[in-house]
Amino acid sequence: DAEPAELAEMQHEFDLHPLAVEDAQHGHQRPKIEEYGDTLFAVMHLGEHENGRTDDLHVGEVDVFVGRNYVLSVRDRSRHGFLGVRARCEREPELLRHGAGFVLYALMDAIVDRYFPVIDAFECELEQIEEKIFSPGTARTNIQQLYDLKRRVLVLKHAVAPLLEAVGKLHGGRVPQTCAGAQDYFRDVVDHLARINGSIDSIRDTIATAIQVNL
């Protein structure tokens, strides 16, 4: 997590917009992408299961400042870094010709990829509950587990749905100049987010049906 002094130094060095810096300093922001002149400020949420445990969902935040010649990321409550993103950019330097927008895409792609194992775990957990849904004497336990799963699925929904809406603006219509060279890549992120969002809605519908069966 960045200290206030570090953010102040970044603001001075890169002429970052004060409102974006304030958001990064306070954290707990809704996923979004905002334009400040010729720069972008993006907020994304990480949803991760820790140490193989699927009964708890750890949510972190990554704030990203994107300018013509720089990309700065600030992590808040996020336990994993993005060395893989740097390695990818170094492994495929020709893609950097698309500018800072490609680095933003690579960061987004890495974050979105981490949603898929969470979805898989949710679906597996739901299947396990469904297998015992008609077993005698399990209704109370089933409902407790279903409501707990519903809560965690909603947390992921709040990470995915706003980001899907925001990223859609980076490949269609008036694309911010900072990302103009990488707009085709953002379409790939939108496709992944739409798939994940659809899976979340399907899981929520199944949970609602299962709760009704147990009532």
Identify the residue ranges that each predicted region occupies.
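Peripheral, non-transmembrane regulatory/ligand-interaction domains of membrane transport proteins
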Residues: D1-S202, A208, Q212
